[in-house]
Amino acid sequence: GTDLRVSAGTYNQYNTSVTHYHRVSEKFAFSAGGFYEYAGGFFENKALDKNIDHIHSTGGRIRSIFLPTANLKLDLNVNYEYNDQGGYPYGLYDKSTGKTADPAYNLESTYHRNLVNTSLNTEYNARNFTLTSVTGFQYLKDRLMMDQDFSVADKYSIMQKQKQQTFS
């Protein structure tokens, strides 16, 4: 069967996903799906006249199960996700007045991520024991940019990048 989901909310929040499940035979089945999420944001950066906390996120997943023999099961999963997010709606705090200013800074603070996860679960059922193996791989590439003085002045900012590949 197929599942389709669509939702909407305040502040331009939208989500949609579709997943299809299919049993091809007694020995093979799979599912495949994807999603998209959008949020326009709630907090405004007064200096840039843009919403700070927007979200664009999309991804997909494939899972397949194969039973080549009565004793052997192979379960493969592949997931991908991309995120593009704004963040950090902070305003400067004034001790003398006890008030926090509206967020207003010169650099847009963002987070971008590409993430791939794959795994292969292998299970062999012998007469007196079960042998299980899980093999996985993850690829992560992301970038964080942040205005750290939280003002219209160009004093402090950070950019952090990472790229990781993990095999287990």
Ranges and model annotations:
Residues 1, 29-31, 71-77, 123, ...:
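Membrane-spanning beta-strand positions in outer-membrane beta-barrel proteins
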Residues 3-6, 44-50, 103-108, 117, ...:
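Extracellular loop and loop/strand-boundary signature of outer-membrane beta-barrel proteins
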Residues 8-39, 43, 47-86, 114-118, ...:
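Transmembrane beta-barrel wall of Gram-negative outer-membrane proteins
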Residues 73, 77-116, 144, 154-163:
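Flexible loop and strand-edge segments within Gram-negative outer membrane beta-barrel domains
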Residues 1-5, 63-67, 124:
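N-terminal/domain-start segments enriched in small and hydrophobic, helix-friendly residues
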